[in-house]
Amino acid sequence: MEAYKEKIKEKLSVVPFEPGCYLMKDRNNQVIYVGKAKRLRNRLRSYFTGAHDAKTTRLVGEIRNFEFIVTDSETESLLLELNLIKQYQPRYNILLKDDKSYPFIKITKEKYPRLLVTRTVKKGSGKYFGPYPNAYAAVETKKLLDRIYPFRKCDKMPNKLCLYYHIGQCLGPCVYDVDQKEYDDMTQEVSDFLNGEDKTIIKNLESRMQAASENLEFEQAKEYRDLIQNIHNLTKKQNIMSADNTARDVFGYYISKGWMCIQVFFVRNGNMIQRDTTMIPLQQTPEEEFYTFIGQFYRLNQHLLPKEVHVPKNLDKKMIESVVDTKILQPVRGQKKDLVNMANHNAEVSLQNKFELIARDESRTVKAIEELGEQMGIQTPIRIEAFDNSNIQGVDAVSAMVTFVDGKPDKKGYRKYKIKTVEGPDDYKSMQEVIRRRYTRVLNDGLPLPDLIIVDGGKGQMSVAIDVLENELGLDIPVAGLRKNDKHRTSELLYGPAAEVVPLKKNSQAFYLLQRIQDEVHRFAITFHRKTRQKHSFTSALDEIEGIGPKRKTTLLRTFGSIKKMREATLEDLKEAGLPEKVAESLQKELNKED
């Protein structure tokens, strides 16, 4: 038995039957998964005994150690789990990232508030309204309010009047003493409007329109009429989801084939204005996954707490209340129950659609590799490794390898190589070096061998790869070449001793797969080459400057990223990056000389 398995077995025997959290670690001692359990020993033992689905099998295959923390209750475990996920960001946990955020309108918490569109919710910095279905809806609403209410626009108070004052869209608090009550009343009207109360604002505009008409200011009256119409268009009811205007989020979920789909409806002013769908591979019980999800949803992510949160009846209300600081309801009848049922049903539909799309994708990719193997006369290439070289006149020469498994990219299997033994532009020798390095490592480390190797190029590249594999390493792996046309697009696949063209139809699934492989390996190689060249040119420019050694070069590279940005930096910027004043002055002088 491997040493780590023996160690895990020993640790399992002393885990208590108490609630708590556990942290799974990989060979690098990195936390790759955080979970919680009512009984720690039972849950941890379950990972290392019996059969698992593919997702859990992958996780268990990477575990080399674990830690656990005992808590007094399940509630405490849930809170601790959320904190540990936030701290370690484990890759096997479903992490709700900030890029899945929604637009809000914000009234800032200032003496003279501003009106902003934002995707970031910062507690205590103002009042937020939304979320809006998209940025366009939020921006259009703000534009409308800007035309009606002269809110301050400047981030910092200027010392002179800006354009907005002169066009009547700001009261000019930067220069004039603006009546605080007038500004507060205006803020309250906007707040009421954003909360769904549009009667006050319409009444206000109708009064202005009437006054303008009586004064024969017909252009002004027409503008007020258009604003009233815009408000009606903006606030007209869609499908009424609720009879009242209470802001509420409605949660539902569905489980199938080891996956959980959670659906959230955002209901504002009686309308469903947005929804959120999240797919989760189950590692815990569905209920535990839900508690973790909803905790992340509001605590770790940019979601504004509504007045009410509605959840299915079968969940533990107290567990949810421990991580969500608002009113939790579990409707049992009426319209609110119908909303929860609708969220559950939509979760089911979303999950079934996901499975159907996966099945179609699997069908296409399996068909592609089967067709490829058949046309080449080899066994179906389950694992394909493809290589491409990149350099400019032999300078900063690099190579890259991508891996496709079952016709799909396996990014864990991607590799990058800096060419070490080749002088000048020699594509054949570069390919020879990389093939030798890759498959020597594969043999030494007992890694899986590919069913097919694809090199970018023709007979020459194929020949040097085959020579290394067969004559140096004793490996018999099919090697094919991918040739491009004059437009640099995939043209044909070459295979066999004479590097003959494999008869593939251009519209076949196999040819589409080859195009994807060639594009991906080219992208990966080019990106690596650009980064290598940029780093090399960056460090070369600093070689002649006294006082800048390897460590300072690295620091400058991380701070500025390019010579151009370093040239634009002030003396203070360079000093903040850790350079002594004299060295910073020398650097500025040298860089400006190059200019």
UniProtKB/Swiss-Prot annotation:
Pfam families: GIY-YIG, HHH_5, UVR, UvrC_RNaseH, UvrC_RNaseH_dom. Signal peptide: none annotated. Residues 199-234 form the UVR domain. InterPro entries: GIY-YIG_endonuc, GIY-YIG_endonuc_sf, GIY-YIG_UvrC_Cho, RuvA_2-like, UVR_dom, UVR_dom_sf, UvrABC_protein_C, UvrC. One of its GO terms (molecular function) is DNA binding. Keywords: Cytoplasm, DNA damage, DNA excision, DNA repair, Excision nuclease, SOS response. It is found in: Cytoplasm. GO terms for cellular component: cytoplasm; excinuclease repair complex. One of its GO terms (biological process) is SOS response. Interacts with UvrB in an incision complex. Belongs to the UvrC family. This is UvrABC system protein C.
